[in-house]
């Protein structure tokens, strides 16, 4: 078995040199992701597609996850590759694979062919289709809108029988576009906007303005690491945390109430622009949508943009909130966003929807900009790959357990979707499911006379959640790592 990875069609409208470069980058990205956790799997550039071979049942799911979550891929064909003697041999192999699939249904046959053969693609389609129609009495040929399309490819002396077709993310390979800096809060909007730029081929670095203490920062680190791990782990990117509480305190003390929201956003953009310039990044990404809150009117957005020369990208500018939430659900960030605290919206009681330049400048004249310079100077810059390591170092008091006694409860903190895909069943041990986003509010409702071992797939989320629980006074918490 092998995977035939088809780049997104937009790649093929590029010039020959650009197309080759894009596919080469996609090949490198896939190899980096796939060979990190597998052995013996080969990733080969076949010019117009990428072949992933050397698979067995052990690595099939890991590779499938990689090709369906890597930007720049339109679709992937999961194929069984065999040799063939002639058209009749091809027909017999197709019949063996598709007999049960087409029983009682309408079907057609579609062939792609490369190389020199004594038959054309249409001749082969007619031969195989006619044979299937005769061999399976309950099946009927229907060339338009059939129930089943029997697909296969003939590549020189090899026959690729298509087992399944898996949709890809689309977009451009990661790293083909310039880097961007996402101003991420952990909510629905910033997570989706970050994903859209990953999908479009930009390496996304994350910048977080902390207004809510350690718990908020841990939450945003979790969603940033999740996005990177799931969609962009072939890239080395940074996570920048800025303690913005001194800036907020200065605004609350000195700035007129109605101007606070816009001025806070202007401070965000100033800070982001300063960091972007240091990192050589040309654009900042925000999750702002037109009219969603008072600071996001056209007038206010214009005043916000004017404080920096760095390009500000707003991929969600015309999106409805419902559509944003739907995408967050699809990409896996909805559960993070549901419980992520949002602080910016409550900074002003009577926010202006049409700020005036002179008023803003008058209020900002009261602001001590050395505070902004200091928080940027003190910003913590880290490789996003270090978040997993940091979670271990920050929580050395969290005991790691690999063997279980019968008197403990394993707390599966994965999302419902992850639990459904691979349920955690441990013979003789009680397993409860409490998603990570409900830990803070519902852990206290559990029987505190018992010991709880938190479990997630990679151990990052479980360690971070254990740290939060211990900081809140719970002593009956450990991490389960089988």
From Swiss-Prot:
KW Signal (keyword) present = no
Query: Which keywords does this Swiss-Prot/TrEMBL entry list?
Result: ATP-binding, Cytoplasm, Disulfide bond, Nucleotide-binding, Redox-active center, RNA-binding, Thiamine biosynthesis, Transferase, tRNA-binding
Q: Which residues form the active site?
A: 456
**THUMP domain residues:** 61-165
Q: Where does it mainly reside?
A: cytoplasm
> Which residue intervals define the domain Rhodanese in the entry?
404-482
UniProt cross-references to InterPro entries, sorted A to Z? Rhodanese-like_dom, Rhodanese-like_dom_sf, Rossmann-like_a/b/a_fold, ThiI_AANH, ThiI_N, THII_Thiazole_biosynth_dom, THUMP_dom, THUMP_ThiI
GO biological process assignments: thiamine biosynthetic process; thiamine diphosphate biosynthetic process; thiazole biosynthetic process; tRNA 4-thiouridine biosynthesis
Identify the domain of life: Bacteria
Enzyme class, first EC level, given as a word:
transferase
Binding site residues for ATP: 183-184, 265, 287, 296
Enzyme Commission number(s): 2.8.1.4
Reaction(s) catalysed by this chain's protein: [ThiI sulfur-carrier protein]-S-sulfanyl-L-cysteine + a uridine in tRNA + 2 reduced [2Fe-2S]-[ferredoxin] + ATP + H(+) = [ThiI sulfur-carrier protein]-L-cysteine + a 4-thiouridine in tRNA + 2 oxidized [2Fe-2S]-[ferredoxin] + AMP + diphosphate; [ThiS sulfur-carrier protein]-C-terminal Gly-Gly-AMP + S-sulfanyl-L-cysteinyl-[cysteine desulfurase] + AH2 = [ThiS sulfur-carrier protein]-C-terminal-Gly-aminoethanethioate + L-cysteinyl-[cysteine desulfurase] + A + AMP + 2 H(+)
Which compartment or compartments is the protein found in? Cytoplasm
Pathway annotation from the record: Cofactor biosynthesis; thiamine diphosphate biosynthesis
Q: Which family does it belong to?
A: Belongs to the ThiI family.
Q: Which PANTHER family match?
A: TRNA SULFURTRANSFERASE
Protein name, per record: tRNA sulfurtransferase
User: What organism does the UniProt record list as the source?
Assistant: Aliivibrio salmonicida (strain LFI1238)
């Amino acid at each position: 078995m092998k995977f035939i990875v088809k780049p997104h069609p937009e790649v093929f409208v590029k010039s020959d040199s650009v197309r080759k470069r894009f596919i080469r980058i996609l090949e490198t990205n896939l190899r980096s992701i796939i060979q990190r956790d597998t052995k013996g799997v080969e990733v080969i550039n076949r010019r117009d597609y990428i072949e992933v071979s050397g698979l067995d049942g052990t690595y099939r799911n890991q590779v499938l996850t990689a090709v369906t979550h890597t930007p720049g891929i339109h679709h992937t064909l999961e194929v069984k590759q065999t040799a063939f003697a002639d058209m009749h041999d091809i027909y017999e192999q197709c019949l063996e694979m598709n007999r049960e699939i087409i029983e009682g249904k309408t079907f057609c046959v579609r062939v792609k062919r490369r190389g020199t053969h004594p038959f054309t693609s249409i001749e082969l389609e007619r031969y195989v289709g006619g044979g299937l129609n005769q061999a399976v009495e309950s099946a009927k040929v229907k060339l338009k809108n059939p129930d089943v399309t029997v697909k296969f490819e003939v590549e020189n002396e090899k026959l690729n029988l298509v087992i399944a077709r898996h949709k890809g993310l689309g977009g451009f390979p990661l790293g083909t576009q310039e880097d961007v800096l996402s101003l991420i809060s952990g909510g629905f909007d910033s997570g989706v906007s970050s994903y859209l730029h990953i999908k479009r081929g930009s390496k996304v670095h994350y910048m977080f303005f902390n207004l809510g203490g350690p718990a908020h920062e841990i939450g945003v680190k979790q969603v940033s690491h999740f996005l990177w791990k799931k969609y962009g782990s072939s890239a080395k990117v940074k996570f920048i945390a800025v303690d913005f509480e001194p800036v907020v305190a200065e605004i609350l003390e000195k700035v007129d109430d109605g101007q606070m929201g816009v001025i806070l956003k202007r401070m965000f953009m100033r800070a982001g622009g300063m960091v972007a310039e240091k990192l050589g990044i040309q654009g900042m990404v925000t999750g702002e949508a037109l009219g969603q809150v008072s600071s996001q009117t056209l007038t206010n957005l214009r005043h916000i943009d004017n404080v920096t020369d760095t390009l500000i990208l707003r991929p969600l500018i015309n999106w409805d909130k419902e559509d944003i939430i739907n995408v967050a659900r699809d990409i896996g960030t909805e559960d993070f966003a549901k419980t992520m605290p949002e602080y910016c919206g409550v900074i002003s009681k009577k926010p202006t929807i049409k700020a005036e330049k002179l008023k803003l400048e008058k209020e900002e004249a009261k602001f001590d900009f050395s505070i902004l310079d200091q928080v940027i100077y003190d910003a913590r810059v880290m490789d996003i790959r270090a978040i997993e390591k940091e979670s271990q170092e920050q929580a050395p008091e969290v005991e790691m357990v690999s063997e279980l006694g019968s008197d403990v409860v394993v707390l599966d903190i994965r999302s419902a979707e992850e639990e459904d895909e691979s349920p955690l069943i441990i013979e003789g041990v009680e397993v409860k499911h409490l998603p990570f986003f409900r830990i803070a509010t519902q852990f206290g409702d559990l029987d505190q006379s018992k010991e709880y071992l938190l479990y997630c797939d990679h151990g990052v989320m479980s360690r971070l959640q254990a740290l939060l629980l211990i900081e809140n006074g719970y002593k009956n918490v450990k991490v389960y790592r089988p």
